[in-house]
Regions:
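Fungal secretory targeting signals
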Residues: 1-20
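Beta-strand-rich domains and repeat architectures in extracellular enzymes and scaffolds
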Residues: 27-141
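Short, conserved, GDST-rich strand-edge loop motifs in beta-rich repeat architectures
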Residues: 66-68, 77, 131-137, 180-192, ...
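Blade-edge beta-strand/turn elements of extracellular beta-propeller
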Residues: 91-110, 149-163, 203-216, 254-276, ...
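Beta-rich, blade/repeat-based domains predominating
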Residues: 111-125, 162-186, 214-233, 240-241, ...
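Blade-loop segments of beta-propeller domains
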Residues: 115, 132-187, 192-196, 209-214
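Short loop/turn segments immediately following beta-strands, especially the blade-tip
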Residues: 146-150, 312, 321-329, 409-416
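Blade-level signature of beta-propeller repeat domains, shared across WD40, Kelch, NHL, RCC1
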Residues: 385-419
Length: 419
C-alpha cells in the first residue's frame, strides 16, 4: 500500500524537530547527584558542552547576574539539580578528589550588602581578619574578625591604631597583615589617608604606612596584594575607589599593576594592559603571577559623573597568567587562561597544588593552572574574596556582599606563613 505523501511529510517534520531538541552528542541526564552521600554535589556530563535545544541563558547587565545554574534547559529536567547544588563538579576525577570524602558548605554569618574584602588568616591567633567597604567617602567603617577558637566561630568588630580606611586586599607575611588600603580622605577619624599599602601587627593592633603615592600622585585604589619570598609587594591599582566614592579625587594614574620594594621604597610598574586589574596571586613555585581582570565592571572617571560601576557582560573579565623574569622582578608572556563564566573573577588565591581559586559572582570557581574549570562552589551572595585557614589549610572562608561562609574539603591552600 502506498504511504500518503502528507504522512511522509509529517514524519520528516517530526524527525527534524526531534533532532533539533536532541542534537547528536547530547547525553542524558546532563546533571547527576554524585560524590559523598552527606554532601550536596552535582556532576555535569562533559561540562554540559552540548545542551538540548532550545536552551537559553538570559543576559546579565547592570547589577543583575544570571548564573549558569539559571540557564533554561527545558528538555532535560536533570539540569534543575544544578541550581540547588552546593558544589558543581565539571571534571569528575579531579573535582571529587579535591572535595574529599566529607565536603561541607555552611553559611556561617549573614552580613550587610556592603562589600566585604581582604580576608587574612593569622595562624598564631587562629583568627580571620577582614574588612568592610562602604561609601560615602570619609565614613570610617570598623573592620571584622572571626574568632576560629570558638565553636561556633564568633564575629566581632574592631578599629586598628591608627585606623585604616577601606582595606580592599590583604595577605599575611612575616607575622604581619599587609593591607591594600583603597580609600582616601582629608580627614578620616581625625587623620588624613589616601590609597596605599599598610601593615597591621595583629598582636599589638598597631598599623604602619609603607606606601601612599607614586611620585606625588595618588594611587587609584590599591586593591589586592601579595608578598614574595624577598619581601617585595606586588599589587593592583584599578579605579574602584572613585567609582564607589571611597576617595575625593578622580583617578590621576592609568590603571596598572606594580611591584614595591619596601627595603628601598622603589615602585616599578609590571603591567599596564589590563582595563581594571583586581586580584593578584603568585604560584606556589614562584614562577607565575596571576591577575584578574574585572573591566566588565567599570564606571565613569569624570568628576561629577555618576557613581557606581555597572556590569557589561561583553566587557573584559578574565584571569591572566604571567611568567616572572629579571630575577623575579618583572613579568612577561601575558596570556588569558580563564574567561569568567559568571560575573567577574574578583579575589584570587592559590591552592598548594597550584590550582586557582577565585570569587566570581555568587560562588567560587576552582581552575587548574591552564585555565580548565574543575569545580564551583555555589552561594546565595556575591563572593569577593577567600582565605584558607587552620593547621591543615583545608578549610576555606568566603566573604562578600551579604554573607560569610565556610567550606571544608580536601583541597589545601597555599601556606602564606611559610613564605
Amino acid at each position: 500500500m502506498a504511504i500518503p505523501q502528507f504522512f511522509l511529510l509529517l514524519v520528516s517534520l517530526f524527525h527534524h524537530a526531534f533532532a533539533q531538541d536532541f542534537p547528536i552528542g547530547v547525553t542524558s541526564p546532563l546533571a547527576t547527584s554524585c560524590g559523598p552521600d552527606n554532601a550536596n554535589v552535582v556532576c555535569l556530563d562533559r561540562y554540559a558542552s552540548v545542551l538540548p535545544y532550545h536552551f537559553f541563558r538570559r543576559f546579565s547587565g547592570g547589577s543583575t547576574d544570571i548564573s549558569f545554574a539559571q540557564t533554561n534547559v527545558p528538555h532535560d529536567t536533570s539540569f534543575d539539580l544544578v541550581g540547588n547544588a552546593d558544589f558543581l563538579v565539571f571534571d569528575q576525577e579531579r573535582g571529587l578528589e579535591l572535595l574529599g570524602s566529607n565536603p561541607t558548605y555552611d553559611k556561617v554569618f549573614n552580613v550587610s550588602e556592603a562589600v566585604h574584602e581582604a580576608p587574612v588568616y593569622v595562624p598564631s591567633l587562629n583568627k580571620l581578619f577582614l574588612s568592610i567597604l562602604a561609601p560615602p567617602a570619609g565614613v570610617l567603617q570598623p573592620q571584622l574578625v572571626v574568632d576560629l577558637n570558638q565553636d561556633p566561630p564568633t564575629l566581632s568588630e574592631y578599629f586598628s591604631d591608627p585606623p585604616v580606611y577601606a582595606p580592599n586586599g590583604g595577605t599575611f607575611y612575616n607575622g604581619l597583615i599587609y593591607w591594600g588600603a583603597s580609600g582616601g580622605n582629608r580627614s578620616i577619624g581625625g587623620i588624613e589617608q589616601v590609597p596605599g599599602i599598610q601593615t597591621l601587627d595583629p598582636h599589638t593592633n598597631k598599623t604602619k604606612t609603607l606606601l601612599n603615592n607614586y611620585y606625588g600622585l595618588y594611587f587609584n585604589c590599591v586593591d589586592d596584594l601579595i608578598v614574595d619570598k624577598t619581601g617585595a609587594i606586588w599589587f593592583t591599582d584599578p579605579q574602584y575607589s572613585w567609582f564607589n566614592r571611597l576617595v575625593e579625587t578622580p583617578p590621576q594614574l592609568l590603571t596598572a599593576s606594580y611591584r614595591f620594594d619596601p627595603k628601598t621604597g622603589a615602585v616599578t610598574m609590571i603591567d599596564d594592559t589590563i582595563v581594571q586589574p583586581n586580584g593578584i596571586a603568585m604560584s606556589p613555585d614562584g614562577k607565575h603571577i596571576y591577575i584578574t581582570e574585572t573591566g566588565a565592571v567599570t564606571g565613569s572617571i569624570v568628576r561629577g559623573g555618576p557613581p557606581g560601576s555597572p556590569f557589561n557582560q561583553t566587557g573584559p573579565r578574565a584571569i591572566y597568567k604571567f611568567d616572572l623574569i629579571d630575577g623575579g622582578t618583572h613579568v612577561t608572556n601575558k596570556r588569558p587562561i580563564w574567561y569568567a563564566q559568571d560575573w567577574v573573577p574578583d579575589g584570587i588565591k592559590m591552592a598548594a597544588n597550584g590550582d586557582i581559586i577565585t570569587g566570581s559572582g555568587p560562588g567560587v570557581d576552582i581552575i587548574d593552572p591552564y585555565g580548565v574549570l574543575i569545580a564551583r562552589i555555589q552561594t546565595d551572595y556575591i563572593v569577593q574574596n577567600i582565605a584558607f585557614v587552620g593547621e591543615e589549610l583545608t578549610e576555606m572562608w568566603l566573604v562578600g556582599q551579604g554573607g560569610i561562609s565556610r567550606v571544608r574539603w580536601n583541597l589545601k591552600g597555599q601556606d602564606l606563613a611559610a613564605i
